Swiss-Prot record:
Binding partners and assembly: Part of the 30S ribosomal subunit.
GO molecular function annotation: structural constituent of ribosome
GO biological process: maturation of SSU-rRNA from tricistronic rRNA transcript (SSU-rRNA, 5.8S rRNA, LSU-rRNA); translation
GO cellular component terms, A-Z: cytosolic small ribosomal subunit
Coiled coil: none
UniProt source species: Pyrobaculum aerophilum (strain ATCC 51768 / DSM 7523 / JCM 9630 / CIP 104966 / NBRC 100827 / IM2)
Protein name from the UniProt record: Small ribosomal subunit protein eS8
Family annotation (Gene3D superfamilies): 2.40.10.310
Gene: rps8e
Length: 131
């Protein structure tokens, strides 16, 4: 029996011992969007517009100062300044680092609010007043 028939390193070499080459070059769609950039509490609202699959555009929020807060009792929404991030159930470290994600509890001018939108995907912070 030949050793080549039982060679296990299939991802690097061929049974003949030759080196395997790439089938195609790396396509842009396979690269992904890079490391996650989570929106932070900042001095002003900063957004970036990114081209995504299908030629569509996605608005991403980088820094946030204001949130659209819905007040259930009054049935209206107001633009409120964000004072601080109280807690983030997704990751406790996010609150310490001032990252704003869906599910975060934020302190605003009108009171505590729960973030209902995905700021990194939608480009806006929508929240519902909880106190």
């Amino acid at each position: 029996m030949k050793l080549g028939a039982y060679y296990k390193g299939g991802d690097l070499k061929k049974p003949s011992g030759g080196k395997k080459r790439k089938v195609r070059k790396t396509k842009k769609k396979a690269l992904g969007g890079g490391p996650p950039q989570i929106p932070k509490l900042g001095e002003n609202d900063t957004r970036i517009v990114e081209r995504v699959r299908g030629g569509n555009l996605k608005v991403r929020l980088r820094e946030a100062k204001f949130a659209n807060v819905y007040i259930p009792k009054e049935r209206k929404s107001v633009k409120a300044k964000i004072i601080s991030i109280i807690s983030t159930p997704a990751n406790p470290d996010f609150a310490r680092r001032n990252f704003i994600v869906k599910g975060s509890v934020i302190q605003t001018e009108v009171g505590k609010a729960l973030v209902t939108s995905r700021p990194g995907q939608d480009g806006v912070i929508n929240a519902v007043l909880i106190e």
